[in-house]
Amino acid sequence: MNIHFTYGKEGLNLKLPDESIVYTSNYESADIDAGKMMLHSILNPVGSQSLSKLLQKRKKGKIVIVVSDITRPIPYHSFLPELLTYIIDQGIRKDEIILLVATGMHRASTLKEKVYMFGQYIVDNYLIIDHRAENIDELITLPGKSWSGNEIKLNRHYVEAGFRIITGLVETHFMSGFSGGRKSICPGLVSLDSIQLFHGYNFLNHPNASNAILEDNPCHQENTSVARACPADFSINIILDQNKKINCFFSGEQFDSHETAISYVKENSCKKVEVLADAVITSCGGYPLDDTFYQCVKGLVNCLPAIKENGEIIAFGGCSEGTGSIEYKQLMKKYSFRTEDFLNDIKNGLFFIKDQWQLQMHIRVLKKTGQNNLHFYTSGISHDELSSLSVNAHSFPENMIEKSIQMHIDSIVASGKKIAIFPEGPYCSPIEK
């Protein structure tokens, strides 16, 4: 059978055996315009009054709308204009509205990315602010402590807002169980200290810090407690189909609407593992998720429940922006072929640096497959650099990627191995029985 896999902006077409185990989401395509879907959602909210009624009771201050950054493939341009028009129709001026980008520790958005995400009109007419976790002057310390006993420091614009709206993509998440909802606030809008704790060794070493698991998941418990300390007044949860188009919205009370969205995602993009595969062929999600190797790690971790011990993974990502941050590149190079040393060092608190959590999650994959069986294909990173990233490196020019991967697949098929495939990468998650 011929299967289209997401890869960069264009994708790859690969031939697989008909008997391959296929992990794909089963969302039905929505025929309704995204803006109209969103309006229907906010007029028929889960667990709250409609947005218009809530806005009538708002406190004095700005209307802050929390949005995701470029690493999330939310097509804001398809519904945000309608949301802003709806808010303005309630008697609110444009200069009373702030779009706050929940970057966590990601870099600030570029102008080009803002135009891509929101459209030129919104960029020209609304104030857009990127959260900077390292800027202590832009943080406010709240009374009380988080679930872990940590201080809660949140973005000043969010805390001081007269009305808070959060938006987010709900999908499985390899640390928090599911994304969206409370995750827009923590780690999206918190301090550097909170992010370090949230992504620290102890949290991520817990077996329940994993895809589609919420119970006893320390990441979920922590960010839920932070979100409850300064909750949103309204939440808009977005579900994307396998083509990264909006499938539906669940809006309303922050926690009720998020739980409803999670139930929907579980039903449509979480597939129980019936038979373990000898080899997995997986996308890393395509653009924009696979822009960096750092983000591609999500695709590597996602497929673990579907593969046997010492199984083989063939993964691929466009990596048009390369490996990731400077800190991440340096870390990966320093601990190349020394991943156990890395775990010991962070466990003993010898250091904490940005993006170390991604290597900790990466090591989960290495422990199951070994580095030789963890193949990664890309045209965005040189062979020398890719070889330092604790994978079996395959770097080829763009016009040779598809052919090279197909040859590898053909060799696996010839060996008689049972194959599982993930055409969408981490947007469909295997769940252990």
Where in this protein do the model-derived segments appear?
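Membrane-embedded hairpin module used as a gating/binding unit in multi-pass transport
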Residues: A209-Y287
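An N-terminal, well-structured beta->alpha segment
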Residues: D18-K59
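Short internal beta-strands
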Residues: K94-M105, E312-G318, N373-T378
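Extended hydrophobic packing segments that form well-structured cores
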Residues: N2-Y23, L43, Q371-K433
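Histidine-anchored nucleotide/phosphate-binding helix
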Residues: P73-I92, V297-I307
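C-terminal catalytic subdomain
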Residues: D290-N373
